[in-house]
């Protein structure tokens, strides 16, 4: 079974008003799943659709490492999170976790940035 079938990416969601730079793909979902399976303490944060991009999800690990991918709709990442038994949050309600910012800051210092 393809990921799109399983997670609802192929369902018609009515006429599209906006044309995104690209739609969510199987590879996007698979990347989030691989990230979640290879790290400890992963949580998903759903970001809303914008004029430029489709709905995205940010997976944040326990150490603050993170990745962002398109997911098509919040329902898709909710299904993925349920299957992996991981929490999912709406970033507009909760914001990003402090460990994500701390990770970004550590990376900047390691790379010699400001």
Residue spans for each PLM region:
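Intrinsic disorder
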Residues: 1-114
